[in-house]
Amino acid sequence: MAKMQAKVQQDERDDGLREKMISVNRVTKVVKGGRILGFAALTVVGDGDGRIGMGKGKAKEVPVAVQKAMDEARRKMVKVALKNGTLQHEVVGRHGAAKVLMMPAKEGTGVIAGGPMRAIFEVMGVTNVVTKSHGSTNPYNMVRATLDGLTKMSTPAEIAAKRGKSVEDILG
């Protein structure tokens, strides 16, 4: 089975969402009569202000697979609280054998992230972040691990509410 890593493409529709295609794979199903070829696409969609969604789509044609993935990403969007274009705090995300470490960075650092993680932060609106990935480099696992870490992130107000303290006590 051949694998095609598609160049990350960005598209913006009239709804203001940013779309990036992370990968397109050619897949085959072996049946009695031979092989059936198909394509699997992985995409992310974000609004540039902390909302992010991931989708995967499969079809016989590449454009149909990409469209299915984009539609799923739009349906599965989650909100992540950002702080001045970076993350609230250091966070680790895991999915399968993929483990990603994401750290907030000061202004001017830029997005220091590899592969699929960079696409996620760009469509999400994060401008300064430092990341490191360990383990699996499979694009799907890396995207899921990144989203896992981002959804675990808490704001100071949420932490203060859990502990029954004021935000000033939490921030020091």
From Swiss-Prot:
It holds the Pfam family Ribosomal_S5. One of its GO terms (biological process) is translation. GO terms for cellular component: small ribosomal subunit. InterPro entries: Ribosomal_Su5_D2-typ_SF, Ribosomal_uS5, Ribosomal_uS5_bac-type, Ribosomal_uS5_C, Ribosomal_uS5_N, Ribosomal_uS5_N_CS, Ribsml_uS5_D2-typ_fold_subgr. The keyword RNA-binding applies. With S4 and S12 plays an important role in translational accuracy. PANTHER family: MITOCHONDRIAL RIBOSOMAL PROTEIN S5 (PTHR48277:SF1). This is Small ribosomal subunit protein uS5. It comes from Cupriavidus metallidurans (strain ATCC 43123 / DSM 2839 / NBRC 102507 / CH34) (Ralstonia metallidurans). The gene is rpsE.
